[in-house]
Amino acid sequence: MLKTEHISFQYEDGKQALTDVSIDLEKGNIIGLIGANGSGKSTLFMQLLGINKPSDGTVYFEGKPLAYTKKALFALRKKVSIVFQDPDQQIFYSNVRDDVAFALRNLGVSESEVEARVTKVLDIVGAKDFQHKPVQYLSYGQKKRVAIAGALVLDTDWLLLDEPTAGLDPIGKKIMMEIIERLASQGKKILISSHDIDLIYEICDYVYMLKDGSVLTDGETSSVFLEKSNIELAGLVQPWLIKLHQQAGYPLFKKEADFFAHTGKVTN
């Protein structure tokens, strides 16, 4: 269990970044975190990783208040991993397999176990075809998959994804969505922070909407996005499938493929 209860956080310069924020990562398998720039999404990620300690309120990990000791934070970060928007921030080796294996080798895991776990996660993210390719020759999307593999290799339970589809072409975005859904089907809990509203609508089953460091609203994905007034108040826009439903009278579809199947058109 990973959640926050009424946490607030103020930076040293006096800026209030979070105010009375409560989120529960057990609310869904894939949870969306949305809000305009400066709404507190990145700061909240740092709270969930134990990098910053709240000024008020509590972060709960595995049913207990998080203790900010070296031992407690080590245990947290073995189970909660982040994948940054820019994969180059967390890829340090020129060889894909060595990069993914880095954390395990640093922990003294046996080489046979390292090889088995690296092979497993590279298969999960569809990176086996380029596992021996020098990192500098990988595409941006391939680097993102390597970064996810590096997070998964520790047998992470909770995965925090910062803008997972940013900078990807349509095929790359489709592959990333398939990876996220595959991970969720395997029992991983995923929190996605993104400005890609259509992605959040299609892939998430629960959403938290932030505004000025506070939770403006939360709930099942469709119910959150149907409330146009809240969307506008947060400085966001509705997903196109919601707009078609509310403005053109189409049935409410959760996925693009379902809409095109209904209209008799084919999409890739």
Curated annotation (Swiss-Prot):
PROSITE patterns: ABC_TRANSPORTER_1, ABC_TRANSPORTER_2. It is found in: Cell membrane. Pfam families: ABC_tran. Residues 2-237 form the ABC transporter domain. One of its GO terms (molecular function) is ATP binding. Keywords: ATP-binding, Cell membrane, Membrane, Nucleotide-binding, Translocase, Transport. It is a peripheral membrane protein. Disulfide bonds: none annotated. Its main location: membrane. Its EC number is 7.-.-.-. One of its GO terms (cellular component) is ATP-binding cassette (ABC) transporter complex. ATP binds at G35, A36, N37, G38, S39, G40, K41, S42. It is an enzyme of class 7 (translocase). It comes from the Bacteria. GO terms for biological process: cobalt ion transport. Probably part of an ABC transporter complex. Responsible for energy coupling to the transport system. Belongs to the ABC transporter superfamily. This is Putative ABC transporter ATP-binding protein lmo1207. It comes from Listeria monocytogenes serovar 1/2a (strain ATCC BAA-679 / EGD-e).
